[in-house]
Amino acid sequence: MFVHNEVNLRLEKKQFLRSYGRRRGRNFRENKLVGLERFLASHEKLENLKSEIVLEVGFGFGEHILKKAIDYPDKVFVGAEVYVNGIARLLEQVELHELSNVLIWNDDVRLLLEKLLCKVFHKVYILFPDPWPKRRHHKRRIVDVPFFQLLSRSLHPLAEVVVATDDHDYAQQIYQSALEVFSKVENTEIPKNASRFASKASNRIFGYKMVYDATDA
């Protein structure tokens, strides 16, 4: 059952960005982002799309979202990422494959979710978010109850949310948070080729699939 708690979902941008580390690698060249503007997502653009929309939060270097966009050209894939090297890599591949069904949100995804006024997403992937393993940094973890509550406002009925991590402690937090928001939470298998994080995972991969049932709201 969807549980709506009285929480203040409108947080300042500076609070959001504490969830992220360094935003660009060394020796990054700005010309790698040429052409990004025409692929940028906005809440107005998403609210006016007629196609099925899939969101990936933190796409890294874009392996997963790229493959999905190639395999499902009738769907629109929105990738949210703050790391500019990853954005540049995905942008390069999108142009190489001449894809027209990829949009990029190059900032904290919560800033986008706050602006959305209607149900837009049919599926959401959150694959290997930064676990911030040190206890004093746990508050920087992006996946928690307030995040799921914020996300749920933009989910279509019966939309699926898939989350994966190889950090056992974070997995427990994700699972308990999901139980407070989603009507259905179950284990799901995450393929090793889902991303470079999955392929390099030395620990067990914990995968969860949540189903949002708007009738329980």
Curated annotation (Swiss-Prot):
**Coiled-coil segments on the chain, per record:** none
The pathway is: tRNA modification; N(7)-methylguanine-tRNA biosynthesis
- List, alphabetically, the PROSITE patterns matched: SAM_MT_TRMB
Q: Which family does it belong to?
A: Belongs to the class I-like SAM-binding methyltransferase superfamily. TrmB family.
Sorted alphabetically, which NCBIfam families does this protein's record hold?
Answer: tRNA (guanosine(46)-N7)-methyltransferase TrmB
Keyword terms, alphabetized = Methyltransferase, S-adenosyl-L-methionine, Transferase, tRNA processing
- Residues recorded as binding S-adenosyl-L-methionine, renumbered to this chain, are 56, 81, 108, 130
Main EC class the enzyme belongs to: transferase
Q: Which HAMAP family match?
A: tRNA_methyltr_TrmB (MF_01057)
The task this protein performs is described as: Catalyzes the formation of N(7)-methylguanine at position 46 (m7G46) in tRNA.
Q: Name one Pfam family in it.
A: Methyltransf_4
Check the record and name the InterPro entries matching this protein: SAM-dependent_MTases_sf (IPR029063), tRNA_(Gua-N-7)_MeTrfase_Trmb (IPR003358), tRNA_methyltr_TrmB_bact (IPR055361)
**Lineage top rank: taxon:** Bacteria
Enzyme Commission number(s) of this protein: 2.1.1.33
Task: State the active site.
Answer: 130
Q: Which organism is it from?
A: Neorickettsia sennetsu (strain ATCC VR-367 / Miyayama)
Q: List positions binding substrate.
A: 134, 166
Do the record's keywords include S-adenosyl-L-methionine? yes
Q: Which GO terms describe its molecular function?
A: tRNA (guanine(46)-N7)-methyltransferase activity
List the catalytic activities from the record: guanosine(46) in tRNA + S-adenosyl-L-methionine = N(7)-methylguanosine(46) in tRNA + S-adenosyl-L-homocysteine
Would you tell me the protein name for this molecule? tRNA (guanine-N(7)-)-methyltransferase
